[in-house]
């Protein structure tokens, strides 16, 4: 195509025809496109990858608080990060999950209670609470204490150890499986560092693999506070054997009983937003798609998308914001600062009003090994923003108003996305008009051996490389390994210059992707050897594998129209004029 604004495709399978009528040439293409166009940007030996997502796209079913206590104290603990305002240290943990892999090593039966160790937030009112409202999580806080089974004050009997008789072993009326407790057989224990990571001070775990909705997650953990040891749940080596064997006087086995561990339930196989464990799933962590994050060349910003993306919010007309935010008007405060992600300088030292950049603090604002972004508020776009925008002068009623969806001003009603935390992701679509906060950024991945362009068996001739807008020459500035899908910069000056290098290419689609139909027609009329005009029509549409399209993967049907003209002529007087210029 004789145009720099519209580019054709290289990897096509179909029919091409070229017709000529006098000085008019018509080229038509009707084919299947078996490639995807993409581009990557590299700088200083590494690839710059971009990410963007809206706030509804939190990383669900992967990050969990260990107790309501840790959730309730999370905001306060990180109010003055990087200092963490608590003296808790989790020293031991076991994480158990539904065994989908049929693994036979490190497996146990368990019965898990959502109210185990809790005091202030109880799902079943029949649970007898003995600990104070602000007590640290501990087995002895209520009647579900596994160390007191069958004794005075216990609401459990020994029958709770047998999966077949769990319900009979619970003396609390109206105690329902799937809500108040879950029982599982042959569950597997996850390996710390390989299958999950633990934040030992803030009290949450991050799984490497997202759980399915019907999978169950439970834990036992031990921690210290000022030298005092607390424990929630039972460990596999706490003296509760996996099996009990009864033998008669003749030495014959008369009965074999499998003993279940009593654990703290973090996720049930039934999703119920009205149950306390719904709040244990963290909804303030987002996935960048990176395997490893480093502070070098990492950028992140938060935007509000209305007529155009801006990094601040403005008051609704006729309803000015109330109090300033830390001495500055809210409308003049960047969203990074407003959401407590910019209070440090590059060296992670506190700085008044921040430095304008995202605070990269491993374990607090990022989980580097998994490429996660972590907000320092449990509900940054919910309760936290509700409090920031409150202007009725009575902060004591905020909790009640927020829970009852009672807004005191139009700014709260416009910006607070409370349904994001009170309902499932799907149900949160009922307020999709509030899903306007967007997180954008970029990270630098290791350069390694060449620049990976995201595919294998790249069609020859489809790679285009530019440096700072200048088109590079293959074989002179770079080489391409089309089989491995890598570009190698051979100009040492370019490598050392840190000029952004953009690689655009097409990679052959793998089996099973949506079928793409590529149709195009290009008409050119040549008036003379110096003057050509043309018009182009291109259409690309996809046919999905199934009639039901996935969210964010909807089939496309895009059309491009273009017009171009090309005029060339020799201008000798310009050459003579340039020749007269002094050297």
Tell where the protein language model's regions lie, with residue ranges.
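Surface-exposed, low-hydrophobicity segments enriched in Gly/Pro/acidic/Ser residues
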Residues: 1-583
